[in-house]
Each structure stands twice: as structure tokens, then as C-alpha cells.
Amino acid sequence: MSYINKNDLSINSTLYEFVNKEILPGTDIKPDDFWEKFEKAVHELAPINKALIQKREKIQKKLDDWHKKNAGKDFNKDEYTNFLKSISYLVETKEDFKINTSNVDEEISSIAGPQLVVPVDNARYAINAANARWGSLYDALYGTDVIPGEKGSTFNKERGDKVISYVREFLNQVFTLKNEDWKEISQILIEDKDLVLIKNGKKDYLKNKSQFVGFNGKKTHPTSILLKNNNLHVDIIIDPTSEIGKYDKANISEVIIESAISTIVDNEDSVAAVDAEDKVKCYRNWLGLMKGNLQANM
């Protein structure tokens, strides 16, 4: 393991080369400038971190000593609470307050949905999580036991029909029509700003028209319809030429649902990154996610 001496820093050569050759290019930051300012940050913040760690160790020792001293005694909640307060492990309860935030992404502030946690050292997991915001509802249902019966080694049309029926019922519940059933719709189009659904030549509309967000394609022949409920979107794909769409009454070939809203890319609890090589692997995966060029073999 070799090191590069830079001013008052000793830098692992693997990390040094990674920063200089992979991170900094394209940022307009010169390597010498980066390491100079990084050195300043290290020497400014390291003593603060060291003091905090020492404080934590002192508190932990007091906790350990108390439990050794009181081993075998009946537990006294009030006594223990007062002890925790005396070592500043607990602080006095303050008055209720609210935090006012601004400029926070909707994914954090107002959209309720699943959040994934993935280890950054596993490129395949990280890529899957990054792409998990949108997923096929058809695929999800076909591949799980939500739909009863065997999947088989080849496409099971009977199972596929059950999936489509299930999704239509989902649309009935979430994007209810004024009069009709999604299962009976034979054509979808747009008139003015309204989503129009047709059964036997008769027009129907969403009970809540505000759920219609937009479309792709022509108004008379849209290729996708975007709907929204509780700030979560569903993209209905219309393709009469696809294997599914050409047999579907309304030529719906796919239903894409907004799923995992955000992802925590973990570089701590689920990752064992000890030496520089481990850490560079993690940093390289993170860099690939930020640049959008991370790849993994399946």
C-alpha cells in the first residue's frame, strides 16, 4: 500500500489517483487546488470530530460504570433517569416547536411512498434501486403470488388475463369513471383538456378530472396517458401493435406505476468499507450514479 505526500497530508495512492483522474475531470477544479483546500478542511474539522468522539467515550464509560455498580439491584426508573440527565445523556424536555423548511424536494416533503436502502458497494443493487421509481404493474403482478396459480416456464395467457383484470379493477378504484367500468372501455382520447373514455360509442370521463395530468401522442390517438393520485403517478401505455395491446379492448399494452420515490444509497451500516480500495469502490459507484453511467453485469 503506497502513499502520496501532499503538503501535510499522507494520501493513499489509490484514492489520490481516483480523485485526480475520475472525480475532478469536468469540474474545472485543479488537483492541487482540491488537495490544498481538502487539507485545510481536514485540519480544521478533525480536532472537532476527535473531541466529540472523546465526549462519547466518556459518556459510555459512565454508563458502563453505573450498570456495573448497580448490577443485581432492583431497577429504579427515577434514579436511572436522574443519572442519565446528570451525564447529559438526557436533556430537559423543551416546549413544542415546528420546523419551517423551504426548497425541499417534493420527494422528501410531500410525496408519500416507499424509500429503498441499498449498499453503495453493490453496483447492481444501486442501479436497480435508482431505476425503481417507475415499474411495470403488469410485471409486478405476473411475477408474484398476488395473482394465484403457476407462472410456468413460458408465458401463461390465462395468468396474463388475470393480471389485466386485476389492473383494470385497480384503475376502477383509484381513477374512478363517472359511469363506466375500465374493463369495458374500448377507446381512449383527449378532447380539449379532458380525458375521454369510450364504450360502445358513448363518452365517459374521470369522476375527478384533476387526476388527468397529461398525455403523449396525438389527442385522437394518444400513446400514453398520465394520471395522478395522492401525488403518485400512473402511466397507461397504449400500443395496438404490441403483443398485449393488440388483443386488449382499449389497446392498453402496459401500466407503469410510480413506486419507490427515493433511495438511500448507504455507505455505512450495510457496507464494510475499511481500507482505501474498499472506499474507492464505493466512491466510484456513487460517482457513476451521479454521472448516470454506472453499469453492472447481470
Pin down the residues of each PLM region.
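N-terminal-proximal low-complexity accessory segments that begin disordered
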Residues: M1-N70, D74, E79-V91
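Catalytic alpha/beta active-site cores
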Residues: S2, N82, S88-M298
